[in-house]
């Protein structure tokens, strides 16, 4: 599962910062790098002039995503 699908499945529609990020990702569906790795998504966010809080939130979400993917493999 890629990061985009994980975020949408887990957080889309929730009234939380993570839900807001998932909503923004879905809203930008045509441009968001759905199959991007961490660096590609960070480049995209910087290119969209995302605020520092958004970047920090993405990094926390990415860590959780990596842990969830690793746990699925166990």
Name the predicted role of every residue range.
Residues 1-23:
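N-terminal acidic leader/helix
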Residues 27-31, 36, 40-74:
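Ankyrin repeat (ANK) tandem alpha-helical domains that serve as protein-protein interaction scaffolds
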């Amino acid at each position: 599962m890629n990061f985009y699908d994980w975020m949408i499945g887990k957080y889309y529609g929730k009234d939380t910062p993570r839900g807001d990020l998932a909503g923004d990702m879905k809203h930008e569906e045509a441009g968001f790098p759905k199959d991007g790795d961490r660096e590609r998504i960070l480049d995209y966010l910087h290119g969209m002039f995302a605020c520092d809080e958004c970047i920090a939130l993405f990094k926390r979400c990415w860590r959780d995503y990596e842990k969830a993917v690793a746990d699925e493999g166990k």
